[in-house]
């Protein structure tokens, strides 16, 4: 599918990062004290004999390394985000010599968090919030050189890229709320001249969807009941009657993924009429809807498509760990080859227009992430720059295991256990002796724990603690029933799931019963407070980060 995921708004300033880091350090110090060990080095030596103590600053403030790898549409260049003089910037390198990278942007204060190649491969776009005033601006920087230029107003306007396609090289679609702060009107942007032309005035529509030829095909409007209506757009005219509607209970798990290049197929991620979100192909000529991808326990969470035809040829689910399913013989062979070459979860980040080069992210779970360039013709897989956190390369980190935990009423929780290095000498996924353990509760609660690497949990395992993070009821990604099972259950069945996870860890010889801490932020912080209020006998201590205290 042509790239039209857009550039999401986002900003994380250095002050905010430092504040979060200091908060985490204080919390970790509290954990060390409350479970009965005052000497972190002694605890690490006893329970993590396989690794030296890693400094807290290295784990929390070390270089983030390479992120958001992309290949240019023409396949000649590869790019990523990495620090330049301490600030995240865009780096580029020829695909023939990816080790010869150079920073193409040189932002000094405001980090770049999202970017994209232009469809003609001659420039890059990135989104930035200057000074934190929420006026998101789209900038363009030419590959050949020169300073960046602002393509959208720099004051009192929030802009975003709505659509771009390798089939249309001279323009992209952008949204801006300069006319009305509530709504984003849709514009066509000439990538060479920078000229903006109004295509559609929003007047209450929250978003627009275009096909690979950048013809606007759908407009989405919110309903008073929380659902969504999808209206057809033809030649710039919006049909007043919706052709599809999404009920409130399906809004989080149903969305338009895009159109095929011939315009005949509309792809959906769709949970309507079923528990889990499936991949649905809607034939717009006949009205027939086929389901090429579905999983009984997990939602379809991402897809990848041929850049020129727009046909989705693989999808991902994550019931416990990431699982990709190819829908064509070629894609199945590619995915199998990548699985043979790389250990861990993969992410297909970007594909060239000719589909001969891919950028693939690797998430080992117990190691920082990496980026790779995959040449499909030669089947060669080349690492693009080492681990995402370069400061940890060569260090021994904890072993992460994906486990399933059954709650008292039969609900299955997908969970992730990380053990200190050297604590599991026979490799059976259980420590040689029970350990002090920290139960990490994710926020939301409409979020989920994943197998991916987390610096804070690594800090704990390096210091001799086992860590356990679990997808209690109310967590997303496991179907509507798993989410709705948490309705009205704050402090009740959602809390029972956490207690059941602790009991499982104790029964498995993982955790010392009298040395279990609970830690979390947002909803996780609430769960900490509820745990200490309702079941204080289960926990030695708890660390609450900005959890709600009253409901």
Residue ranges, per PLM feature:
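Residue-level detector of Asp-centered blade-edge/turn motifs that repeat once per structural unit
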Residues: 73-74, 119-120, 166-168, 212-213, ...
